[in-house]
């Protein structure tokens, strides 16, 4: 499927997190910022989000991934990694694109924090209204 020394790069984004994913053929080892996935993301929900593109395309255990992730929190980072893995998988085989697209894994989730407006306490919270 893929030559020994070839690798595929995918950049994923979610909230303020940016993840650079380098996929190469291997046995399924995923290293995030120099640590194994189990050590970096302890909650199973985040790991499921990260591994979802591989589960959907049935490529689990066929690729090794080296991932660098910057910014954001745990949720943003796991979403960014999943987006990056999906983009890298798309480059490995064009046939996977339809599967990834139908599962919404190639679409960038553009939901970000809403900015604070002047005159309000937060994005939408107004100060208490006094009648008199």
UniProtKB/Swiss-Prot annotation:
> What Gene3D superfamilies does this protein map onto?
3.30.230.10
Q: Name one Pfam family in it.
A: Ribosomal_S9
**Which SUPFAM superfamilies does the entry mention?**
Ribosomal protein S5 domain 2-like
Q: Where is this region: Disordered?
A: 100-132
GO BP terms: namely:
translation
Q: Output compositional bias ranges, type Basic residues.
A: 114-132
Keyword list, A-Z: Ribonucleoprotein, Ribosomal protein
Q: Name one GO molecular function term.
A: structural constituent of ribosome
InterPro entries noted in UniProt: Ribosomal_Su5_D2-typ_SF, Ribosomal_uS9, Ribosomal_uS9_bac/plastid, Ribosomal_uS9_CS, Ribsml_uS5_D2-typ_fold_subgr
Gene Ontology cellular component list: cytosolic small ribosomal subunit
Report the superkingdom from the record: Bacteria
Q: Which family does it belong to?
A: Belongs to the universal ribosomal protein uS9 family.
Question: Which PANTHER family does this UniProt record tie to the protein?
Answer: RIBOSOMAL PROTEIN S9, SMALL RIBOSOMAL SUBUNIT PROTEIN US9M
Protein name as it appears in the record? Small ribosomal subunit protein uS9
The organism is Dehalococcoides mccartyi (strain ATCC BAA-2100 / JCM 16839 / KCTC 5957 / BAV1)
């Amino acid at each position: 499927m893929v030559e020994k020394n070839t690798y595929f790069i995918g950049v994923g984004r979610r909230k303020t997190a940016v993840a650079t994913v380098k996929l190469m053929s291997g046995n399924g080892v995923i290293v995030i910022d120099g640590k194994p996935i189990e050590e970096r993301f302890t909650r199973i929900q985040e790991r499921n989000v990260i591994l979802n593109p591989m589960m959907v395309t049935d490529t689990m255990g066929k690729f090794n991934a080296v991932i660098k992730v910057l910014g954001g929190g745990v949720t943003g980072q796991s979403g960014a990694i999943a987006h990056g893995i999906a983009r890298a998988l798309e480059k490995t085989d064009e046939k996977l694109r339809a599967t990834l697209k139908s599962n919404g894994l190639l679409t960038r989730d553009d939901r970000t924090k809403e900015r604070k407006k002047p005159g309000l306490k937060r994005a939408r919270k107004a100060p208490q209204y006094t009648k008199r």
